[in-house]
Amino acid sequence: MKFLFDLFPVILFFAAFKLADIYTATAVAIGATVLQIGWVWFRHRKVEPMQWVSLLIIAVFGGATLVLHNETFIKWKPTVLYWLFAAALLGSVLVWRKNLIRAMMEKQVSLPDPVWARLNLAWAGFFAAMGVLNLYVAYQFSTEAWVNFKLFGSMGLMLVFIVAQSVWLSRHMPENTQD
């Protein structure tokens, strides 16, 4: 259910684009993200840092799209977000010697240190590549194709990557020995 809640602004963006245009969809995405953050704050009295970053990016890039009436800005938004994720994953290791993937998952999964390092690097690489792919689709295809890619293509690739990571991780997880 949380996954669908996290997709709420993207789904509304897609629907608004299909019913109207990119500018209406952008305004809807900004409003939906504000509502989403408001709901999270109301329910939990806490908003995760990445949710604040996402709100800031949609407000800046979406706002620029609306004010300047130029869809290029909203098309850059996913790339900026992906590249920030990649930079955070790499930067946390290089600067603070902290593996963010490990910090998020180590309570659920026990893995050797080298596997954590490769997993962090794999996710950083995935996000960097997704940023490049988003730009490729944004500049080489129509706005409609980009909107479809934003919802279906990027989510599909994310799902495939998660499944591949799960299969790879299963080889490195300690086996449960029950007597």
Curated annotation (Swiss-Prot):
Record localization: Cell inner membrane
InterPro entries tied to this protein: YciB (IPR006008)
Pfam families according to UniProt: IspA
Disulfide bonds: none
Keyword Transmembrane annotated: yes
Superkingdom field: Bacteria
One Gene Ontology cellular component annotation held by this UniProt entry: plasma membrane
Residue stretches spanning the membrane: 3-23, 24-44, 49-69, 76-96, 121-141, 149-169
Keywords (A to Z) from UniProt: Cell inner membrane, Cell membrane, Membrane, Transmembrane, Transmembrane helix
Topology of this chain in the membrane: Multi-pass membrane protein
HAMAP family, per database record: YciB
Stated role: Plays a role in cell envelope biogenesis, maintenance of cell envelope integrity and membrane homeostasis.
Family membership noted in the UniProt record: Belongs to the YciB family.
Full protein name: Inner membrane-spanning protein YciB
